[in-house]
Amino acid sequence: MPGFLVRILPLLLALLLLGPTRGLRNATQRMFEIDYSRDCFLKDGQPFRYISGSIHYSRVPRFYWKDRLLKMKMAGLNAIQTYVPWNFHEPWPGQYQFSEDHDVEYFLQLAHELGLLVILRPGPYICAEWEMGGLPAWLLEKESILLRSSDPDYLAAVDKWLGVLLPKMKPLLYQNGGPVITVQVENEYGSYFACDFDYLRFLQKCFRHHLGDDVVLFTTDGAHKTFLKCGALQGLYTTVDFGTGSNITDAFLSQRKCEPKGPLINSEFYTGWLDHWGQPHSTIKTEAVASSLYDILARGASVNLYMFIGGTNFAYWNGANTPYAAQPTSYDYDAPLSEAGDLTEKYFALRNIIQKFEKVPEGPIPPSTPKFAYGKVALEKLKTVGAALDILCPSGPIKSLYPLTFIQVKQHYGFVLYRTTLPQDCSNPAPLSSPFNGVHDRAYVAVDGIPQGVLERNNVITLNITGKAGATLDLLVENMGRVNYGAYINDFKGLVSNLTLSSNILTDWTIFPLDTEDAVRSHLGGWGHRDSGHHDEAWAHSSSNYTLPAFYVGNFSIPSGIPDLPQDTFIQFPGWTKGQVWINGFNLGRYWPARGPQLTLFVPQHILMTSAPNTITMLELERAPCSNDDPELCAVTFVDRPVIGSSVTYDHPSKPVEKKLMPSPPQKNKDSWLDHV
């Protein structure tokens, strides 16, 4: 008998230990699900509704993630919503970026640490006023590819990408101890022409395979049967989006036609609206947003405020709409937190509304970050683009009988220089012409170093030029951002059609893909000798409206003896026209004060240095404010206040811009403006 007890004692101890452990695991099991009987979410078995705000980690530097998230929490939000831009993480096939500003896992973990839940929107298409709606440009290497469909080439790329991304997200799901409560599949698919349910089913299966059967998957579409017809799919919970101009009852009735039971959800309640170059800055009155938010919350609905902070389209990440209208660098969105993360009147008004329904955290709200006006900084001309081709295109040009697109020369963003020779004398001005929509998006034209003007997509398609037979014809073509919404997201860039000179097709092109990023980062002003006046002839003979595209460089030091520097600032461009600007190799984005409405660019403090002078590099594309005779006129100014909504915008040289290419949402009914988008 004692021997028997000795043998079974370990087993008895194991059973005693196992019982409490299993009970504890069941007691602490995390669950987030839909209770269809009570029309609500259940969080760990208790009724729950989220009040969320959109923040795009790709538009806010990592340096400021915690600051922005804390401000969102202190506003009374219990969740955030964010997109995952595919092209932000896989710039080239199989080359992934998940560190520093691209570290989405850290961003989500940080939200979790701060007590915020997450609504994740991993696409693969996201819209978001982001370059190509988040789809990587390299997909267009298959020229006939049908994006956002069951096209085999597209599905293969999507399957591979989601096979990388979603396993990273699975440990962050709520039921696995993380913050992610729901995951969106695709994005407003009902607004796309393809209406391919096989594609949606493929995504549904892929998401389930990688994330499991317990996670709540959902779709978002405009609150109208037209959009829900192709956007909703059985097995994915249907949600809607609408703004202050919509009838809330009608909007949620649209959702109810697809989801008779379950929580009411507005996945994008618009706190503001997007901007386009050459159009007035969009705003929505605080009172209208607050009133509509109150009405939504009074119905017991879950809601996401799009945007709560907009942020910045750094570098080349802005998108565009059709008819072609590119979005500016600022994505301020008239949101409750400004582009720079500052508290606004709208922030406090919405906090007060939320406080009527949910407990708002106590304690101090993180203040707006201080700004500093560093003043005027002189710049000098470094080199024209044409004089720097050995630096900008070290691998050499590509020869082609006819023009090639950016994708065909392995260039995704930025600039490509197209060069040929004039086949005939043009002593009298001869028309250089592109078919309508043949230049994507702007071409800066010169003949033998003499600026001739600009060809512009959908706008200027013919330019009269002069020159002798055999003269060098240069077109520096700029990608202004790929279309992010609608049927034309397969937006090829460059010279996408043949050009003609007096009706004769131009051939024998030499094409230079320009690596401006590496040139700026690697050289930062050390490009050998500067231009020494040998282009003065171009100044003398060119139209007064244009100069050759050229790089300019300047340096400034952070003042000593002032505590807490560096601080955020804004760079202003008095007298400059259009171009790209870098500080210490960081691509701030596009400036275009000649067109507006944005006149300043946000400069976050973390890119500035106190230990050494800071280097400003500018690529001015149209006209600098100085010449070799007046170099002191080349300057920028650092100010402590943004100007993103100039009241009057003028195109270069001096003509008013046609406004409202894409209407802002009216205050009455969003359904009407959706018909125009």
UniProtKB/Swiss-Prot annotation:
Extract one GO molecular function annotation from the record: beta-galactosidase activity
The protein's annotated catalytic reaction(s) are:
Hydrolysis of terminal non-reducing beta-D-galactose residues in beta-D-galactosides
> What's its top-level EC category?
hydrolase
Major location (coarse): other
A biological process from GO? carbohydrate metabolic process
User: Entry's Gene3D superfamilies?
Assistant: Galactose-binding domain-like (2.60.120.260), Glycosidases (3.20.20.80)
InterPro entries given in the database record: B-gal_1-like (IPR026283), BetaGal1-like_ABD1 (IPR048912), BetaGal_gal-bd (IPR048913), Galactose-bd-like_sf (IPR008979), Gly_Hdrlase_35_cat (IPR031330), Glyco_hydro_35_CS (IPR019801), Glycoside_Hdrlase_35 (IPR001944), Glycoside_hydrolase_SF (IPR017853)
> Which residues are the signal sequence here?
1-23
Q: What is its EC number?
A: 3.2.1.23
Please note every region of biased composition (Basic and acidic residues): 668-677
Q: What is this protein called?
A: Beta-galactosidase
Q: Which organism is it from?
A: Pongo abelii (Sumatran orangutan)
